[in-house]
């Protein structure tokens, strides 16, 4: 699990293919996490932390869930805003005019299509 303290700021993570993104509080500090799903022990540990209230104020979503991939998309990113709104960002390398930066490369986003989609969080904060 990749975790960053993110008090008061929007957080973006890239490379979603089935992973989850979450925000939560632990010892009064707000964090955002990118959680891989192939590993059942991670899923079990996460669900236990939520159930046992080791973490609270949990907002969990899956950027790839329930939406068709927009043609030309080379990557799906997740965004959780400072006020826990969840978004999926479809990124395309070949279409101007908007651009997104990833590492040392600049990727163009898809024009004329809705590329930023708000996703409802998963109720209860546990992975199914």
Per-segment meaning from a language model:
Residues 1-128:
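Active-site microenvironment for binding and transforming phosphate-containing groups
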């Amino acid at each position: 699990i990749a975790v960053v303290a993110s008090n008061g700021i929007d957080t973006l993570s890239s490379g979603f293919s089935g992973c989850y993104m979450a925000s939560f509080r632990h010892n009064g500090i707000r964090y955002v996490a990118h959680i891989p799903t192939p590993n059942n022990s991670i899923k079990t540990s996460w669900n236990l932390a939520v159930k046992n209230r080791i973490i609270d104020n949990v907002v969990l979503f899956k950027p790839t869930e329930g939406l068709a991939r927009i043609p030309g998309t080379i990557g799906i990113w997740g965004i959780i805003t400072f006020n826990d709104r969840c978004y999926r960002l479809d990124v395309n390398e070949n279409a101007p005019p908007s651009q997104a930066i990833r590492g040392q490369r600049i990727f163009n986003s898809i024009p004329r299509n809705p590329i930023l989609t708000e996703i409802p969080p998963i109720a209860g904060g546990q992975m199914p």
